[in-house]
């Protein structure tokens, strides 16, 4: 934001639009653009539509086509996990056509924590959509309530419910659900997107762009929603 501090607001705005076009927005840039959108006299009906209009359509379609090729359809084992907020979350309670995004992470995993900014952007994007849920599962790590609360407070994470992966019988490794969805690996962060009892998308690692991660998650959600729309016709 150095251009803004120098009073070069037009240049700063153009730079932020460039970041949006390239899929390289940080949460700060995203919020600044939201503020600018509110001042526009002529604009699309929603901020999200305006942001989408800044991105080259051919690049967006290229990314979507790549993601379509990565859509899978693998049944997942039913699970029950303890919630950091209290109570339990059961996969049996997920509704028909509900899309559930699960982010497997750990307190010791720096890339996992770095990716949470992008996941917050995705959570905010679907904050008013009751058909999409997000859960953040502590795996391969003992959940430290004080550290989790401190991390959430420091970064102002909102509406990001933390779950605790289950322990195998006789062990203390907290990886039961993780292992059932990602057999043969132990790498995190991992994302799994679920729908109607099946894993529909999986992704490992973090590319470093918060808005790039938001786009990836939202494009997959759009693809899965389109499936439902086609089925209804």
Model-predicted segments: where are they?
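Short pre-active-site segment immediately N-terminal to redox-active cysteine/selenocysteine motifs
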Residues: 97-100, 104-108, 141
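Thiol/disulfide oxidoreductase modules built on the thioredoxin-like
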Residues: 155-158, 166-222
């Amino acid at each position: 934001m150095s251009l803004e501090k120098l009073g070069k607001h037009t240049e700063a705005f153009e730079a932020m639009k460039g970041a949006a076009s390239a899929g390289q927005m940080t949460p700060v840039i995203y919020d600044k653009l939201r503020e600018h959108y509110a001042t526009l006299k002529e604009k699309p009906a929603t901020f999200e539509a305006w942001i989408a209009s800044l991105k080259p359509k051919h690049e967006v379609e290229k990314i979507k086509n790549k993601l379509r090729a990565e859509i899978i359809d693998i049944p997942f084992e039913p699970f029950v996990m303890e919630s950091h907020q209290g109570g339990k979350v059961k996969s049996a309670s997920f509704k028909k056509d509900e899309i559930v995004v699960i982010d497997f992470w750990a307190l010791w995993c720096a890339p996992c924590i770095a990716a949470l900014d992008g996941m917050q952007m995705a959570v905010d994007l679907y904050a008013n959509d009751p058909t999409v849920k997000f859960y953040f599962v502590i795996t391969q790590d003992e959940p430290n309530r004080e550290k989790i609360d401190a991390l959430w407070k420091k970064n102002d994470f909102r509406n990001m419910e933390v779950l605790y992966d289950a322990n195998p019988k006789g062990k203390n490794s907290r990886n039961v659900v993780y292992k059932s969805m990602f057999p043969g690996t132990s790498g995190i962060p991992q994302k799994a997107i679920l729908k109607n009892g099946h894993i529909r998308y999986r992704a490992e690692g973090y590319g470093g762009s918060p808005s790039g991660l938001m786009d990836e998650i939202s494009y997959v959600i759009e693809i899965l929603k389109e499936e439902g729309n086609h089925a209804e016709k």
